[in-house]
Regions:
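Conserved helicase C-terminal RecA-like lobe
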Residues: 164, 179, 314-319, 370, ...
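ATP-hydrolysis module of ASCE/P-loop NTPase motor domains
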Residues: 19-20, 81-84, 102-207, 230, ...
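P-loop NTPase Walker
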Residues: 1-108, 112, 119, 224, ...
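Inter-lobe coupling/hinge region of RecA-like P-loop helicase motors
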Residues: 6-10, 14-28, 54, 104-112, ...
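Coupling/hinge elements of helicase-like and P-loop NTPase modules
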Residues: 132-145, 161-167, 296-348, 365-371, ...
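Conserved helicase/translocase P-loop NTPase motor core
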Residues: 89-93, 184-232, 242-248, 358, ...
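Conserved RecA-like helicase ATPase core segment
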Residues: 2-8, 24, 32-34, 40, ...
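Conserved RecA-like ASCE P-loop NTPase motor core of nucleic-acid helicases/translocases
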Residues: 52-63, 84-86, 236, 262, ...
């Protein structure tokens, strides 16, 4: 390994990179260079320990993080690499199952369902479940989302259906008749859900982990193959693992336990997704010989910011690793700047707070800062509305960042509206939206005339279009509407024999929109074309995974996805190039840095939020995670605030609240 590269590391980083055999826990505070440590350790193992790249398994939590890690290693290696396994937990398990599924009686060509698809699946098979309380006669689908969340959490906790049933029967006296009946209904439903998916050759994302656990537990020879294959394991963001993922890591590590995990319990912000902070706290109990190395030199923030963040997170004691392991996690800034104190804006109402923030931003941009230097961080998307209004009134350009939802992009919503029109031509808003598209060349006055006619005649908007000759319109507008109606009828005739994607393609052709999309003139038009292409890619995937890909089924799936807040990601903008104030949630700010940061709306009930109760919680006795002594919801909210503070470069940080 290049000695100059090692010299660039600080002593703590160097010790982590050059650690020999056995388990290693690297506690990497914010801005301490954890990604550098992981990539340098991979290089060290290959060059100095003479490992083959294929003998190293590196796991993380997002495709983006896996891609960045892979790219760094690729660029750093003098001869490149082949067959290295750097991926997310789910991608790794999918790869294993595609190869080994037959060993546990599964079809290797299973289809993977997203959130909305699992909802559809459960609704379609709801009456195959022996449900009473959880399928009320008046509203049979009332508990569908709650059941799915319940099943997902059971998988996070590595609880099998048989284990659930056994627990209910063994505790019948303590539970009482009513509770025993409810829990037995849930346990049986969980069992039925798993059996139905196996019959239909489908899986949800939680199955990827649990099925690989099943494979390794029931086929020890296959587990040994993978243990021998991977001489070293590296796990990034270990604080985000759930119980099932932790068990997978433990099995793969085996007796040799050449395992490096990088974590920071103070940055555990995904409990709502099943992450178990106890995995970090209990690591040395599971691996008694583990070495612990703490990275405390911060290369991002000023000491002022780090001190305030540390002061905040102390309130989570004694449940923090620093207390449990009696170590020092206080971060020390490598920057030779003390930094400005955090400023506080206090107002009486939300609207006043938003106006004060907008005024402050105007002042900052008149000095040395540009709009793109500034970020407004909110706890949740729906907390941003007052601030967007205030920024607009002040003439301040802004962009709402984070993973943009494809189904909510205007150009994609137009196409979804057309599918909704075909599914139900009485859907007035859908018809209106489609006719508002520039490609049809109708004015607002034309649409208002049709709307007024429909209201007077007590008919649907589309029916009014069919009677365009009777509407007060000029001849040109009448011809356009007639042409539109003819196109819709042609496409309605195709509903029985064509998929939604194919009909939508005919719409692009017949409307003239396809020609416009392939002849874009601006960057914005190019992005619109890319988003529409992504929609068709997603429709193609849906068609491949479902026998019924009709307009009706596709509209139901998209509606469910939008209702659940799920969607494929749209193309992201070049954030640096856009000279606009950046508005984003704290969770979606991960990996981003801004010179000026506003933490807004810090008021009880919003940040910290009120605890979100699960509709159907798991019994505490079944939870395998060792729960903290304190209020774990409030601790998570503190960690979320700490997470954002400690990732701020800290030239200027402003906190506002009412």
């Amino acid at each position: 390994m290049n000695k100059n590269q090692l010299k660039k590391l600080n002593p703590q980083q160097r010790a982590a990179v050059r650690y020999g055999q056995g388990p290693l826990l690297v506690i990497a505070g914010a801005g301490t260079g954890k990604t550098t440590v992981i990539t340098e350790r991979i290089k060290y193992l290959i060059v100095s320990k003479k490992l083959k790249p294929a003998e190293i398994l590196a796991l993380t939590f997002t495709d983006k993080a896996a891609g960045e890690m892979e790219e760094r290693v690729d660029l750093a290696m003098p001869y490149g690499y082949t067959d290295m396994w750097i991926s997310t937990f789910h991608s790794f398990c999918d790869r294993v199952l595609r190869q080994e599924a037959l060993q546990i009686g599964l079809n290797a060509n299973y289809q993977l369902m997203g959130g909305a698809e699992t909802t559809q699946f459960l609704i379609n098979h709801l009456f195959k479940f022996k449900l009473g309380y959880y399928r009320p006669l008046g509203n049979p689908t009332q508990f569908v989302e709650g059941l799915l969340q319940h099943f997902s959490r059971l998988k996070d906790e590595d609880i099998q259906p048989s284990e659930y049933v056994h627990w209910v029967k063994a505790n019948s006296l303590q539970l009482g008749t009513d509770n025993q009946k409810k829990y037995l209904e849930l346990a049986t439903a969980y069992q039925t859900y798993e059996e139905l998916k196996t019959q239909k050759d489908v899986m949800d994302f939680g199955d990827l982990i649990t099925r690989v656990l099943q494979l390794f537990r029931t086929r020890p020879n296959i587990l040994r193959q993978y243990q021998q294959k991977f001489k070293y394991l590296l796990i990034d963001e270990f604080q985000d693992t759930n119980i099932a993922q932790n068990e997978l890591v433990r099995l793969l590590a085996g007796k040799q336990a050449n395992l490096t995990v990088v974590a920071d319990d103070d940055q555990a912000i995904y409990r709502w997704r099943g992450a178990a902070t106890a995995n970090v706290i209990q690591f040395r109990r599971n691996f008694p010989k583990a070495k612990l190395i703490t990275l405390t030199q911060n290369y991002r923030s000023t000491q002022e910011i780090l001190d305030r963040a540390y002061q905040l997170i102390q309130h989570n004691n004694p449940d923090r690793l620093e207390v449990k392991e009696k170590i020092n996690k206080k971060l020390v800034s490598a920057r030779q700047v003390v930094g400005q104190p955090i400023k506080l804006i206090l107002t009486g109402r939300l609207e006043d707070e938003a106006e004060a923030v907008a005024k402050k931003i105007s002042g900052l941009t008149k000095k040395k800062y540009q709009y793109q230097d500034i970020a407004l961080l909110v706890r949740a998307n729906n907390h941003a509305e007052a601030f967007t209004r205030a920024l607009s009134r002040a003439g301040i350009p802004y962009q709402f960042l984070g993973p943009g939802q494809l189904f909510r992009q205007p150009e994609v919503k137009d196409l979804i509206a057309y599918l909704k029109l075909l599914d139900n031509f009485e859907d007035g808003p859908a018809v209106y939206r489609v006719l508002s598209m520039g490609v049809f060349g109708l004015s607002g006055r034309d649409l208002a005339a049709i709307s007024n006619f429909a209201r007077r005649q007590n008919m649907a908007f589309f029916e009014a279009c069919e009677q365009a000759d009777q509407v007060f319109l000029n001849q040109e507008a009448r011809e356009k509407i007639k042409k539109f109606v003819q196109m819709v009828h042609r496409h309605l005739d195709l509903l029985v024999k064509e998929t939604a994607g194919q009909i939508l393609y005919y719409f692009l052709q017949d409307s003239g929109l396809l020609e416009q999309l392939t002849d874009y003139k601006t960057v914005a038009q190019e992005k619109q074309a890319q988003n529409i292409a992504k929609l068709f890619d997603r429709l193609k995937s849906y068609e491949a995974a479902h026998e019924d890909a009709s307009v009706q089924a596709t509209v139901a799936w998209i509606s469910l996805a939008m209702e659940r807040g799920e969607s494929p990601l749209a193309g992201t903008t070049d954030w640096v190039a856009e000279n606009k104030v950046n508005l984003l949630t704290i969770h979606s700010a991960k990996g981003l840095e801004f010179p000026v940061v506003f933490l807004v709306n810090l008021v009880s009930g919003r940040f910290p939020t009120r605890e979100r109760q699960e509709q159907i919680p798991i019994p505490d006795e079944l939870i395998k995670e060792i729960l903290p002594e304190g209020d774990y919801h409030l601790q998570e909210e503190r960690r979320l605030n700490f997470f954002r503070l400690s990732k701020t470069p800290g030239r200027k940080t402003i906190i506002s609240r009412q």
